[in-house]
């Protein structure tokens, strides 16, 4: 996407491979013209920059932060007690307008706490959510929440759907995103009290709500936004990651089992590399937060330089769309949608529209 923006603030001390891999990813992004400000202990960050021969001509700067949030730290307490930690300083830069967004591979709970504490929420937003981009057969469907809110109420799912619709449309360019709630079946009677109440409300929302989807639908690309509570979403995400790893290992063993299979593997190497790249979580880079007054991306704790570079790029892309400006307007009717109509229970709103295949582009 085009257009100049303020730099992306990157937590240089977040993640299992910090600061080395984080700094390398930031340098790689800067070499491609993406402005970056690295946040962390200045001497240590500059030492890493020297190792990567990051010259002064790059759009890259260092902003000091004297404290670090460790993975074992309590998120809320760390934000309050370590006021100069690298995560909080990143958000301070975003809040002041000196950064267009932030990226951290550190303590995800601390990132969420920092976002709420420093940036705040758009008017009407009950709880922010973590969004994941799924490696589907077609398109780039979103799934939320992925762990921010494990115990949800119907209002949370309704707002997740409305915020996800905005992100899909504004950031991913989907003209009319199809929204579904993850459930144990497509029938209206399936699900829980939580999902049925949310579904009844979303049928009245000004969005393309297509009802329930099942776990088998997550990677088909038939829907653009999949809504669930943070507990279920996180379990589903980790299940997909584990499945991809096991399938990859099975494939590797099969291609090495005989001479013929080894030859077949060599002949199909390009196709296999393309598939590997498609399902590689590092290509996504990070999971955006929605429901806060700023752009924030949470990267995997195991992120390497490639993942950080891609997270910086995606944070910049999101910042350019100014999607946050629309969030408050999108969630404004959410409470009214949950009110039970005078002529019947919320669950009795007629049949849910069935999904149809997306138009070919």
UniProtKB/Swiss-Prot annotation:
Pathway: Lipid metabolism; phospholipid metabolism. Its EC number is 2.3.1.274. Catalyzes the reversible formation of acyl-phosphate (acyl-PO(4)) from acyl-[acyl-carrier-protein] (acyl-ACP). This enzyme utilizes acyl-ACP as fatty acyl donor, but not acyl-CoA. Pfam families: FA_synthesis. This is Phosphate acyltransferase. Keywords: Cytoplasm, Lipid biosynthesis, Lipid metabolism, Phospholipid biosynthesis, Phospholipid metabolism, Transferase. Belongs to the PlsX family. It is found in: Cytoplasm. One of its GO terms (biological process) is phospholipid biosynthetic process. Homodimer. Probably interacts with PlsY. It comes from Anaeromyxobacter dehalogenans (strain 2CP-C). The keyword Transferase applies. Transmembrane segments: none annotated.
């Amino acid at each position: 996407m085009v257009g100049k923006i303020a730099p992306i603030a990157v937590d240089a001390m977040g993640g299992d491979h910090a600061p080395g891999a984080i700094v390398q990813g930031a340098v790689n992004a800067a070499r491609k013209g993406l402005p970056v400000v690295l946040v962390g202990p200045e001497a240590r960050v500059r030492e890493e920059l020297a190792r990567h021969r990051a010259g002064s001509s790059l759009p890259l700067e260092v902003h000091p932060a004297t404290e670090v949030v460790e993975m074992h730290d309590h998120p809320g307490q760390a934000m309050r007690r370590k006021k100069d930690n690298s995560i909080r300083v990143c958000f301070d830069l975003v809040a002041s307008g000196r950064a267009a967004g932030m990226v951290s591979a550190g303590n995800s709970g601390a990132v969420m706490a920092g976002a709420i504490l420093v940036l705040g929420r758009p008017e009407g937003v009950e709880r922010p959510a973590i969004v994941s981009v799924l490696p589907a057969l077609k398109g780039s469907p979103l799934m939320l929440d992925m762990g921010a809110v494990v115990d949800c109420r119907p209002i949370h799912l309704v707002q997740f759907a409305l915020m996800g619709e905005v992100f899909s449309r504004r950031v991913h360019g989907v003209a009319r995103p199809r929204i579904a709630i993850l459930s144990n079946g497509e029938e209206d009677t399936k699900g829980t009290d939580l999902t049925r109440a949310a579904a009844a409300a979303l049928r009245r929302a000004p969005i393309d709500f297509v009802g329930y989807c099942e776990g088998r639908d997550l990677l088909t690309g038939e829907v653009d936004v999949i809504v669930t509570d943070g507990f279920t979403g996180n379990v589903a995400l980790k299940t997909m990651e584990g499945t991809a790893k096991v399938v990859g290992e099975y494939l590797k063993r099969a291609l090495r089992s005989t001479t013929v299979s080894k030859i077949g593997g060599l002949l199909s190497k390009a196709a296999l590399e393309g598939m590997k790249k498609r399902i590689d979580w590092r290509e996504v880079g990070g999971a955006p937060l929605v429901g806060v007054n700023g752009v924030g991306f949470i990267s995997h704790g195991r992120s390497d330089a490639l993942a950080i570079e891609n997270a910086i790029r995606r944070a910049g892309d999101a910042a350019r769309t100014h999607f946050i400006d629309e969030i408050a307007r999108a969630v404004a009717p959410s409470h009214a949608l949950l009110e039970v109509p005078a002529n019947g229970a919320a669950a009795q709103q007629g049949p849910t529209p069935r999904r149809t295949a997306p138009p070919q582009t």
